């Protein structure tokens, strides 16, 4: 039996990136459902999404609510996949990483990419890198977590594990 894979995307003003991101996801992931939650982008992101011809694409446009956490929850509620993934909408170039990440779910409950381990990388400006590292350090200390990059923009996990936690 082939497992269904869901990738959740949250968008706000991603008109320049969203089509490429979805194209890359479709190219690299089998049995794929894509759930996009748009926060009423004024740049036409939602209109672009409506024109994408992919039968397993679900699109939601929120008029008042905003934010990543609530977008993820809305996407999760409306998803059907055995695996649930998240990708920042402007990170389509990383879609090629998902097949290996999904394969690693045979041995792990969650798989994420980290900017802060050997082989990782962060191309943002120095202020954003420092701020991100500080947030991650404080979060790891408070949560007593060994995960190096709690704010990673790409992860995948088993649906069952996620629902057990919720």
PLM regions and their residue ranges:
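Acceptor/aglycone-binding surface of glycosyltransferases and processive sugar-polymer synthases
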Residues: 62-78, 83, 95-166
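Short, well-formed alpha-helical segments that are part of the catalytic scaffolds
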Residues: 14-27
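Donor nucleotide-sugar binding loop of glycosyltransferases
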Residues: 14-17, 41, 94
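Short, conserved SAM-binding/catalytic segment
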Residues: 51-54
């Amino acid at each position: 039996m082939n497992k269904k894979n869901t990738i959740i995307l949250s968008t706000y003003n991603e008109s320049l990136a969203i089509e490429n991101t979805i194209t890359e996801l479709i190219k690299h992931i089998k049995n794929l459902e894509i759930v996009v939650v748009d926060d009423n982008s004024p740049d036409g992101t939602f209109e672009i999404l409506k024109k994408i011809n992919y039968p397993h694409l679900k699109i939601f446009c929120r008029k008042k609510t905003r934010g990543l956490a609530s977008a993820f929850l809305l996407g999760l509620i409306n998803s059907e996949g055995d695996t649930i993934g998240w990708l920042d909408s402007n990170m389509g170039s990383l879609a090629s990483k998902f097949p290996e990440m999904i394969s690693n779910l045979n041995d792990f409950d969650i798989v994420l990419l980290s900017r802060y381990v050997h082989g990782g990388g962060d191309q943002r400006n120095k202020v954003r890198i420092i701020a991100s590292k500080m947030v991650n350090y404080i979060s790891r200390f408070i949560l007593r977590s060994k995960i190096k990059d709690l704010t990673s923009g790409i992860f995948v996990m088993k649906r069952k594990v996620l629902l057990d936690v919720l």
